[in-house]
């Protein structure tokens, strides 16, 4: 059995401004989750979507009782590169400062997300946004719909 594939996205009307996040499981989009904040950033919504998706699914077990493999698919290079290129390891080592010696943005979301990634069998895959990927288009619509009006 392959991994549980979860698509995630974040949206923001203005940056900062009101924003929304969403996730949905492939192949049909169910289950899914979404929410929003009155004042946020697009990057923050991208990270929150992944955090909520993993909080919802991390306790699932595979057929052998181990952690179910999960693949997060995102159009956010910010999220995907953090894990693919291990940015988070450097952030921790450098006291939560980025390569420019500035405080890492959204550390309040990154820390719990990194803890979940450490204890979950999860991989990350980037997908080009607005490229006709049906599931990416779905989570984009859900995230936009979740933006507070």
Predicted segments with their positions:
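RNase H-like nuclease fold core
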Residues: 1-44, 55-57, 144-145, 149
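A two-mode feature
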Residues: 116, 139, 143-148
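RNase H catalytic domain
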Residues: 11-15, 51-138
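Short, conserved alpha-helix that lines the donor NDP-sugar binding/gating region
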Residues: 46, 50
């Amino acid at each position: 059995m392959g991994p549980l594939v979860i698509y995630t996205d974040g949206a923001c009307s203005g940056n900062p401004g009101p924003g929304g996040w969403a996730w949905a499981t492939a192949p049909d989009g169910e289950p899914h989750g979404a929410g929003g904040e009155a004042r946020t950033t697009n990057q923050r919504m991208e990270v929150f979507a992944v955090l909520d998706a993993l909080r919802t699914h991390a306790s699932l077990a595979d057929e052998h009782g181990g952690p179910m493999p999960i693949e997060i698919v995102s159009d956010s290079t910010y999220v995907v590169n953090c894990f693919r290129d291990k940015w988070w390891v450097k952030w921790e080592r450098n006291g939560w400062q980025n390569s420019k010696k500035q405080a890492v943005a959204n550390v309040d979301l990154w820390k719990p997300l990194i803890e979940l990634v450490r204890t979950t069998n999860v991989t990350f895959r980037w997908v080009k946004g607005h490229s006709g990927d049906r599931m990416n288009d779905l989570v984009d619509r859900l995230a936009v719909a979740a933006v507070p009006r």
